Amino acid sequence: MEYVYMMGFLAALLMALGLTPLVKRFAVRVGAVDAPNQRKVHTRIMPRLGGLAIYLAFIGAFLVALPLMEGYKPHVIWGLLLGATIVTIVGALDDRFDLSPKVKLLGQMLASGVVVAFGVKVDFVTLPFGDGTQMGWLSIPITIFWIVGVTNAINLIDGLDGLAAGVSAIATGTIFVLSLLMGNVTVALLSAVLLGSILGFLFFNFHPAKIFMGDSGALFLGFSLATLSVLGFKQATLVSFVVPIFILGVPLSDTFFAIVRRTLNRTPISAADKNHLHHCLLALGLGHRNSVLVIYGIAAMFATSAVLLSTVAQWVALIVIAVTLLILQVGAEMIGIVQKGKRPVISFVQRLLSLKQSERM
């Protein structure tokens, strides 16, 4: 079975390498370009629509590998492919015509509804040290909310060359590893093919980028990752609920901090700003490439935690969760991603240390 995964991965990688230059020329020809402005980091007009190359490589390679596959679930596959096609079309139209947020949201909800209609749902949740809970009819809105939320979270971090693609590749690789451990052949093949298509595109998208993925890429990757995470972790365990959140830790935490920041500043949650994780790292003077590499490292930390959560005892999993969240909070305070100058956890630790020093004296 392993050769099928490898074949799908290599086919997607080669297709993405071949398709991306063609999509780049097509984007310029149809006027799907991204002009620099106050919020953006790039300083010259860049072609968008890179997501089309990722999508086409994914579809093409998957169709090549699928006939060699055994034990897959066809309804799940076609639900994912149909939903992914919808969001990619919506994203491509936005790359060219700048659709309104309401239209894009409607397209995302439609794609999510298609996946749910094909039977992909979050229908079981387990709480720590408790019994599992069947979600019943709530599984439908919860699944749609999850898919739409992750889709937009990937879109939010797409602010530096190679950032969204690299973080998505790390998340996809993690899903692939965990799906192998759990014996989920359908998710393993889908994630192997998706990983190959992302890496092939990343060759052209890493700094200095020759093409942007655009909304066609961000929406496709976010939708695919959200759906794969639902497919891969439906077991009745504590970590089945937490693992997908950790796999997508970078985009989800950045989105969470953005919501908190805008709430504290009394600005609309949908209002754009330059205080996302990559903006904060740039402000520290790390530079474009180093900022991206640091975020790759954070994504790898979340990925490692996700794998540990799936392989250790429950009490160890709770410790891993607590330590990871503590590191995340301290890091957020150090770079000022929520509010500059406010460091509650760091200040608390400093007060404890000063008290201990005074007691010794």
Language-model region placement:
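Short, highly charged, low-complexity non-transmembrane loops/tails of multi-pass membrane proteins
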Residues: 341-359
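N-terminal hydrophobic signal/anchor transmembrane helix of membrane proteins
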Residues: 231-237, 323-340
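"…together with the soluble PPM/PP2C metallo-phosphatase catalytic core" -> "…together
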Residues: 1-255
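Extracellular/periplasmic helix-loop-helix junctions in multi-pass membrane proteins
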Residues: 303-322
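Hydrophobic membrane-spanning alpha-helices of multi-pass integral membrane proteins
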Residues: 58, 197, 284-306
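Cytosolic, membrane-interface loops and tails of multi-pass inner-membrane proteins
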Residues: 21-46, 257-289, 355-359
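Membrane-interface capping segments at transmembrane-helix boundaries
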Residues: 22-26, 331-347
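Hydrophobic transmembrane alpha-helical segments of multi-pass transport and channel proteins
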Residues: 18, 251-256, 304, 330, ...
